[in-house]
A protein has these predicted regions:
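C-terminal structural segment of proteins
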Residues: 2-171
Length: 171
């Protein structure tokens, strides 16, 4: 995917669920010359739990799978609640963590709780991998710190202390 992004430059867009990008294309607000699917990249659809309780959430993990993960439900309760607040079952199934974070929307359902849990965005590009705190990744509405030749591979969440919790406000 990184090689294809370098090859096609600003004319390419990454796609997984497509719930945001396809709407923009239909409205003719986006017209990429190349769509690069990340659906076959191994590991992007996995939630990894480390021994210390920290999580790596692959960028292609669906909103539904994230919200149903046992550790997310028990320790990152507010994040599980945010997953349940999505507008439709179709969006929960098709929408991805990467899409929700990378579109930079101020209305992104996951971002507030990811900020509460001190998330870092994991990126991979030609120089290698880098980790960017989510609050620095979100530059302004619709703009993120991802470089044109980078792929978001996941989100890292530090462990949550036993007995602590954060919940999403009712919407």
């Amino acid at each position: 995917a990184v090689r294809l992004l370098q090859q096609h430059g600003e004319n390419a867009r990454l796609i997984a669920g497509g719930t945001h990008l396809l709407v923009l294309m239909k409205m003719e607000r986006e017209a990429p010359r190349a769509l690069i699917s990340v659906n076959k990249i191994p590991g992007l659809d996995v939630i990894t739990v480390h021994a210390d309780g920290s999580l790596i959430i692959g960028s292609r993990v669906s909103i539904r799978d994230l919200g149903r993960h046992p550790l997310v439900r028990s320790r990152y309760t507010g994040l599980a609640q945010a997953c349940e607040s999505f507008g439709s079952t179709q969006i929960e199934i098709m929408g991805t963590v990467g899409g929700n974070v990378c579109n930079g929307s101020p209305a992104a359902d996951l971002v507030p709780m990811l900020l509460v849990f001190n998330a870092e965005v994991l990126l991979k590009g030609p120089p290698g991998e880098r980790s960017v705190p989510l609050e620095q990744f979100l530059v302004r509405p619709g703009v993120t710190a991802i470089r044109p030749d980078e792929v978001m591979v996941g989100v890292s969440l530090p462990p949550v202390a036993v007995g602590s919790s954060a919940t999403a406000p009712d919407t």
